[in-house]
Design a protein with these regions (language model features):
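Flexible "cap/lid" subdomain of the alpha/beta-hydrolase fold that forms the substrate-access gate
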Residues: 1-21, 28, 36-41, 48, ...
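Catalytic histidine-centered segment of alpha/beta-hydrolase-like enzymes
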Residues: 332-341, 345
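Typically the conserved alpha-helix immediately C-terminal to a functionally engaged Cys/Sec
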Residues: 64-67
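Structural cue for short, hydrophobic secondary-structure segments
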Residues: 51-54, 78
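C-terminal alpha-helix
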Residues: 347-355
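Conserved alpha/beta-hydrolase
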Residues: 69-88
């Protein structure tokens, strides 16, 4: 396995990221070492929350939330998934299976001897993290999830599978305009409808070798004016992103892990791994979902409520875990850790304190 490591100089002078790095070596199935990075702040004797990020973000996504946890003396740990942030980046598409990510993060959890945890996950952080919780339940006291879930669609019509396959193989790469229009159309629709919308994001990410992560996060995560975003997008389309003179801080931060396109295999390939159709993860998904049906520890569903990509997943999460509680929807879109940091932190902290 060829593994890439982002030079530390790429992370110098990042705004609001003064945190000491922690590294843990895990092992791939082939015996290769993969170094996983995490940040860890707050009192070791206090309650501990572990926050998993999604695609295409990294632990920087939680920088706005960290001060709220520290104020309440809650220890917060935020790892970077392999392929993201300061963690090592395997270079091949086949390295980024759903199962590999689960296995690597279980190793990370065990090697750091973490226990008495509150888990929080969003996007891929929830897909991976919920499977980790199901594998190591004794290490977790409670679970909070938002804008995520454990997708399980074993009975997708053949006509839908064929239409998706044809699109992925033969259609032109979608534009960001195509993606925007299709993703916003996912809200509260049937699984069939969502598959044929989400495929635009899957194809765009895979086809775009130099995925403009900074631009995407500045659009999805807020922090950029409409005119500035349009201008920024024009530079990206011309292949002149590095010459764009008004790059926002959020874009700089989320571009930092990727010195070149070779480092982006994880962010490109993982959307295709989302199990919205029957695939190799089907049995493991069912096993994890069955586990949460009998989960008897505190579980909180805390969705934004205005994220069209994941809105319909909240009902599924509540069905999957019958004893789960539902928090009020706070808005903020897909990456509400960035847009609603205080509101989301308050929900998690209140949930922890109610149970301690």
């Amino acid at each position: 396995m060829k593994v890439l490591r982002t030079p530390e100089k790429r992370f110098k002078n990042l705004k609001n990221y003064p945190y000491k790095p922690h590294y843990t070596a895990v092992e791939s199935k082939k015996g290769d070492n993969i170094r996983i990075h995490h940040i860890e702040e707050g009192p070791k004797k206090g309650p501990t929350v572990v926050c998993f990020h999604g695609q295409p973000a990294w632990s920087y996504l939680y920088t706005k939330m960290i001060p709220y946890f520290l104020k309440e003396e809650v220890r917060i740990i935020c790892p970077d998934l392999p392929g993201y942030g300061k963690s090592d980046k395997p270079s091949k598409r086949e390295d980024y299976s759903y199962q590999n990510q689960v296995d690597w993060m279980v190793q990370w959890l065990k090697k750091n001897e973490l226990e008495n945890l509150t888990f929080f996950g969003q996007d891929w952080g929830g897909l991976i993290g919920l499977r980790v919780v199901a594998k190591e339940p004794e290490r977790f006291n409670r679970v909070v999830v938002g804008n995520t879930g454990l997708p399980y669609n074993p009975n997708v019509p053949k006509s839908v599978l064929k239409e998706r396959e044809e699109f992925i193989k033969n259609s032109e790469t979608p534009t960001l305009y195509d993606i925007y229009n299709n993703l916003k159309g996912m809200k509260n629709k049937s699984p069939k409808h969502q598959i044929l919308k989400f495929m635009y994001w899957q194809k765009y990410c895979w086809d775009t070798e130099d995925l403009p992560v900074g631009l995407l996060m500045s659009m999805i995560g807020g922090g950029n004016k409409k005119l500035s975003t349009s201008l920024y997008y024009a530079f990206v389309q011309m292949g002149a992103e590095k010459f764009y003179p008004f790059k926002p801080e959020i874009a700089k931060a989320f571009d930092a892990p990727f010195p070149s396109r070779e480092y982006k295999m994880g962010v490109r390939s993982m959307p295709m791994q989302v199990p919205i159709i029957p695939d190799s993860s089907l049995a493991a998904q069912k096993e994890a979902r069955d586990f949460f049906k009998s989960w008897n520890k505190p579980f909180l569903s805390a969705f934004a409520g205005n994220d069209p990509i994941t809105n319909s997943m909240e009902k599924d999460v509540l069905k999957m875990c019958p004893k789960a509680l539902k928090a009020p929807n706070i808005g903020g879109g897909h990456f509400y850790q960035w847009t609603k940091p205080k509101e989301l932190s308050d929900i998690i902290i209140k949930f922890i304190k109610a149970d301690t």
